[in-house]
Amino acid sequence: FENIVVTTPQTNATIVAERSGIMSKKVNASIIGVIENMSYMEAKGNKIYPFGKDGGKDLSKKLDVPFIGAIPLLEDITVSSEGSNLFAFKENPEFENIISIANEILKFQPKKKPIDLKIN
């Protein structure tokens, strides 16, 4: 299995995410990398870090895996994802960042065939 560890920048969140990464390694699941969600927000052109800074980067170093990227706290993302249309905010400058993260994930090919789930 391959995993992606997702965290927010807060220390407590990275501690929990680190446990997830350690458990993945114990069961021989590879970790593709770390993504930091709700990394920052922008106000008047300035980045604000309400939950701290670089928690995801620090975690990727601890787990010795790549840091895939940081996703900002952005209302456009929330609104478009709740409406099941992630491309609704493609005019936002952060859209390219999300596409870049997705492309990094797509570079990894599964080491095993995915489990074939049957739904009715």
PLM feature segments, named:
Residues 1-12:
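Inter-motif core of Ras-like GTPase G domains
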Residues 10-13, 39-41:
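Short, catalytically relevant binding-site loops at active-site mouths
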Residues 21-120:
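C-terminal lobe/tail of nucleotide-utilizing enzymes
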